[in-house]
């Protein structure tokens, strides 16, 4: 039978009663209170073997109390509960030394299991990594059960250097997760360097990763530092790792095994100190079976697998995401918008094949092009419905139709401001909204062949590569 004394702090009497009963049945001695002052008095007196506390209490926030608890009794495990189920809540709990974070409502069996695990572990002093208190610019948004699991996993990973493999469809936010792991982790003071394998010509990937020496190949007129060198002391994010050529996979495996690499054309091994985070929208196990991905490299990268759910699997997060993106647009100078409940319901029912990125692009269009303050279901329906394809001649109907559509949007947009002018920066906002679908369509039409896409668009290949990177366009190579 488990033994131990547990201190419970929550201003909700019903929660205190439920926890008291469940923990007592599990064999623990329980003392409960409804405020932080009483909890602190008990802790400072040396009472309790474990603390379970809510974040928001009448007299003090648990995040302000936690550092004092950890300073006075560094061996005392603290489990934090919160109904504020955001990414930053999980991160702040981890930063302030909490043993575990549990979003409300939680499963009592899971809580009992966590309590048992915490009390069974050998006592050790926790090292605090106190972060800032700001809640602005939350990198990940959503309160669904799926996102809560991701937040908790990320919080556990922050103070480690473990290699992480992020899997998820295009547009689910894989780079956002990688950046969060870096920005709130132990390497936050080092560089974060991202490289998208699908956006770089295959014959240049090794040079991009490892750098090259002057004269190592035609056109190498100077020495060039690779991404490993640029990321030294920080994090290297290998996006779309499934598109990495086999030769580069072999070199990457050697780096992971030996902790050193050589530049293209170089002979002297260079020690490396980077954290690797990889991401893919492909099934790497299938690629392994097809002989397109090294199994040994997969196991080196897949130390901690993390799956990001598509937006259709967490539709309850759509309202929070919509509010978040409208606030971002408002900070950029666009008019404030609201979405009525029926329109939100329509957005929640949509399948979102482009996931969060598609939703963000939609919200930006709504903010930039519609004068109405309240976004209605009819507006949403018009945006989500796809027009039937039509056969257009080469002489101009395409341009005429597109031009008429843009003109119609802009006329409505300007009329919404009456005699006033829209916020500055309209040209670049409209250009970005047009560029993204244009470049995506060209890449899709050329099956991801950037040379052909650049020719089709009339762009220099390097210009196209820069735009792909700046617009965060996912390039998927397919064979005919």
From Swiss-Prot:
Domain (Sigma-54 factor interaction): residue spans on this chain: 140-368
The record places domain Response regulatory at 5-119
Tell me the compartments it is located in: Cytoplasm
- Where does this protein chiefly localize? cytoplasm
Classification via PROSITE patterns: RESPONSE_REGULATORY, SIGMA54_INTERACT_1, SIGMA54_INTERACT_2, SIGMA54_INTERACT_3, SIGMA54_INTERACT_4
Q: What does this protein do?
A: Member of the two-component regulatory system NtrB/NtrC, which controls expression of the nitrogen-regulated (ntr) genes in response to nitrogen limitation. Phosphorylated NtrC binds directly to DNA and stimulates the formation of open promoter-sigma54-RNA polymerase complexes.
What is the protein named? DNA-binding transcriptional regulator NtrC
Q: Which gene encodes it?
A: ntrC
């Amino acid at each position: 039978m488990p033994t131990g004394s547990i201190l419970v702090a929550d201003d909700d009497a019903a929660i205190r009663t439920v926890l008291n009963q469940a923990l007592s049945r599990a064999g623990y001695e329980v003392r409960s209170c409804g405020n932080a002052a009483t909890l602190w008095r008990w802790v400072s007196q040396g009472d309790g073997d474990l603390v379970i506390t809510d974040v928001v209490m009448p007299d003090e926030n648990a995040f302000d109390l936690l550092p004092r608890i950890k300073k006075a009794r560094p061996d005392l495990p603290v489990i934090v509960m919160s109904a504020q189920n955001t990414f930053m809540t999980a991160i702040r709990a981890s930063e302030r030394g909490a043993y575990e974070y549990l979003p409300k409502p939680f499963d009592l069996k899971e809580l009992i299991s966590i309590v048992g695990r915490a009390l069974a572990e050998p006592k050790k002093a926790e090292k605090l990594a106190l972060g800032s208190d700001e809640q602005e610019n939350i990198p990940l948004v959503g309160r669904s059960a799926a996102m809560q699991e991701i937040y908790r996993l990320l919080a556990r990973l922050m103070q480690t250097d473990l290699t992480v493999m992020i899997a998820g469809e295009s547009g689910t936010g894989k780079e956002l997760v990688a950046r969060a792991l870096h920005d709130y982790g132990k390497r936050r003071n080092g560089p974060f360097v991202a490289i998208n394998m699908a956006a770089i010509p295959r014959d240049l990937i090794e040079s991009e990763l490892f750098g090259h020496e002057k004269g190592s190949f035609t056109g190498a007129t100077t020495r060039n530092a690779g991404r490993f060198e640029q990321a030294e002391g920080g994090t290297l994010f290998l996006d779309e790792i499934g598109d990495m050529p086999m030769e580069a996979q072999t070199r990457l495996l050697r780096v992971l095994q030996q902790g050193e690499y050589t530049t293209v054309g170089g002979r002297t091994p260079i020690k490396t100190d980077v954290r690797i985070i990889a991401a893919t929208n492909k099934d790497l196990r299938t690629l392994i079976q097809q002989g397109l991905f090294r199994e040994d490299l997969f196991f080196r990268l897949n130390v901690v697998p993390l799956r990001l759910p598509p937006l259709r699997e967490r539709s309850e997060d759509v309202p929070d995401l919509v509010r978040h993106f409208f606030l971002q647009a408002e900070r950029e100078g666009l008019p404030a918008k609201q979405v009525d409940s029926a329109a939100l319901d329509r957005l929640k029912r949509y399948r979102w094949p482009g996931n969060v990125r598609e939703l963000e692009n939609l919200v930006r269009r709504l903010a930039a092009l519609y004068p109405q303050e309240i976004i209605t279901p009819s507006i949403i329906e018009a945006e989500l419905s796809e027009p039937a394809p039509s056969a257009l001649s080469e002489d101009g109907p395409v341009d005429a139709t597109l031009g008429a559509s843009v003109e119609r949007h802009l006329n409505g947009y300007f009329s919404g401001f009456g005699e006033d002018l829209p916020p500055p920066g309209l040209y670049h906002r409209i250009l970005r909204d047009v560029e993204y679908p244009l470049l995506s369509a060209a890449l899709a039409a050329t099956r991801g062949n950037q040379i052909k896409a650049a020719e089709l668009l009339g762009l220099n290949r390097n210009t196209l590569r820069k735009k792909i990177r700046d617009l965060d366009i996912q390039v998927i190579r397919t064979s005919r």
